[in-house]
A protein has these predicted regions:
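Phosphate-binding site recognition
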Residues: 1-150
């Protein structure tokens, strides 16, 4: 059971009804249910849900680790063959290629600040992907989710 989030569900549903793709940001303190809210929205509305989560910031984690984690998660969740990635441009292009045009889909980029923390080009690559790929899809919500320090 999910309690106390009806306003957020309504806002997401309103976005879902629009005839264009939507880009949503979701931020808040750690462990308050941000990712669960998005997953529950997808479940309630019976839409395809792809969750890609950045690796936690810790010693030894590199941009390549983040890219390969993205590739593995994408492969696992879409039933496609794992193929290593070398840059975020290619990562977002692969994601775009796996989002079906006729299938309602929610893509959650979770812990996005961790995901892109080692590549100064990450924000620009994400912007390019939104402007030139994701925004062209009319059955897509892309959610950028991150935690803030309390």
């Amino acid at each position: 059971m999910f309690v106390g989030r009806e306003e957020q569900f309504k806002q997401l549903k309103d976005l879902w009804r629009k005839p264009v793709a939507s880009l949503v940001t979701c931020r808040g303190r750690r462990r308050i249910g941000k990712s669960t809210l998005i997953a529950e929205f997808a479940r309630r509305n019976r839409v395809r849900f792809i969750k890609l989560e950045g690796l936690p910031s810790r010693e030894g984690v590199t941009n390549d680790d983040q890219l390969q984690a993205f590739a593995r998660q994408l492969s696992d969740q879409t039933g496609t063959k794992y193929e290593p990635l070398t840059c975020w441009f290619d990562a977002f292009a692969r994601l775009d290629g796996l989002v079906e045009q006729k299938t309602k889909t929610v893509v959650l980029l979770d812990e996005i600040s961790w995901m892109g923390m080692f590549d100064v080009n990450f924000p620009g690559e994400l912007k390019y992907a939104w402007d030139n790929r994701f925004s062209k899809r009319n059955k897509l919500i892309v959610v950028l989710c991150g935690s803030v320090s309390s």
